[in-house]
């Protein structure tokens, strides 16, 4: 599991947190992969009854990390650290950003998104994927 997303499981609750507080949890290629891996890791867990997705720090997710755009553009292969490659999901071609949202829809357990601070762009997309959203009144969406 990546340091970009942490998972703590206790009493049947998977506490899944985006973990780039210094960047307001903005996503880049590594973060997209880490989100997908986190969701995938919960699929076959019989000890998890619910997942709560949130962000460490003062924001859920401020969207794309613009500083990673140039690295994504210049990467020519999927193995580049910051690339967000097109991949297969249930037989369809999808972008890693779509997979980061879709993975929460695939879980057979309820997924709750706890939002505060910002949920912009890619962060908004990831906030809309879970089954339930709990939103702080000052959240910017």
Model-derived features: positions:
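Conserved CoA-thioester-binding segment of acyl-CoA-metabolizing enzymes
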Residues: 1-56, 72
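Hydrophobic/aromatic residues within transmembrane alpha-helices
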Residues: 16, 53, 65, 126-128
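Conserved phosphate-binding and hydrolysis motifs of nucleotide-dependent enzymes
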Residues: 19, 25, 63, 117, ...
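A short, glycine- and basic residue-enriched loop/turn
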Residues: 21-24, 58, 67, 138-140
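Glycine- (often His-adjacent) and acidic-residue-rich active-site loop
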Residues: 47, 55-100, 119
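Glycine-rich beta-to-alpha active-site loop
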Residues: 96-141
């Amino acid at each position: 599991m990546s340091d970009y997303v942490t998972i703590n499981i206790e009493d049947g609750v998977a506490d899944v947190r985006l973990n780039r507080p210094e960047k307001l949890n903005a996503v880049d290629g590594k973060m997209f992969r880490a989100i997908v891996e986190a969701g995938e890791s919960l699929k076959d867990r019989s000890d998890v009854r619910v997942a709560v997705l949130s962000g460490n720090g003062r924001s859920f997710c401020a969207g794309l990390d613009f500083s990673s755009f140039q690295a994504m553009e210049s990467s020519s292969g999927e193995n580049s650290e910051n690339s967000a490659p097109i991949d297969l999901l249930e037989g369809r071609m999808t972008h890693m950003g779509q997979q980061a949202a879709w993975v929460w829809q695939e879980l057979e357990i309820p997924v709750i998104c706890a939002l505060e601070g910002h949920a912009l762009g890619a962060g908004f997309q990831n906030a809309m994927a879970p089954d339930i959203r709990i939103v702080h009144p000052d959240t910017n969406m």
